[in-house]
């Protein structure tokens, strides 16, 4: 093996990682689409309804979407930190955002027999960056679908001169110790549960970009 030249350019690890994350994200997106297609097939042509295979396919879809969302969040956080994220707040209808997020989450909800509803006035508008807020809402929906028992509700309403988006489920909720930690929980990780706090950190960063005075 020839010796490394002193003039050889140094590897830009950040560029390498970004390129790798993009590649993984695209591959996971294709895998998620294939799994969604498999779950959408009629039972007589695809995976039998109520079979263990359907449940395992739904769980695989959840995990693929979860990892893909985390990669997208990492990319967005890096760009925000480096001040080159193309932040693009525009006035948009909240109902369209809700329907788009629900459409992405419905294959998993349907396969698990979970009822999903949304409550949002058609004339409710807000100023926000679509991709960032969509990512936060989708993350919340996926978490709700994972922990709920039977029902998830996505709602949006006018609130205090702005808008409020809420995702509710009938699961056990956050444990008391996590609620007591508040924002501090975003900074820690748990080897026991595998929780990195990335979703909460991302949501907090997105809220910070959508501030008006002391409101976000």
Model region roles, listed by residue range:
Residues 30-49:
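Conserved C-terminal segment of the DHp
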Residues 62-70:
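Short alpha-helical segment of the dimerization/phosphotransfer core of two-component systems
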Residues 88-91, 115-124:
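Conserved catalytic submotifs in the C-terminal HATPase_c
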Residues 82-87, 125-128:
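Conserved micro-motifs of the catalytic ATP-binding
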Residues 168-194:
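Glycine-rich/acidic phosphate-handling loop/turn and adjacent ATP-lid/helix
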Residues 151-161:
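Short beta-strand/loop element within the Bergerat-fold HATPase_c
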Residues 202-215:
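Conserved glycine-/histidine-rich ATP-lid loop and adjacent helix of the Bergerat-fold HATPase_c
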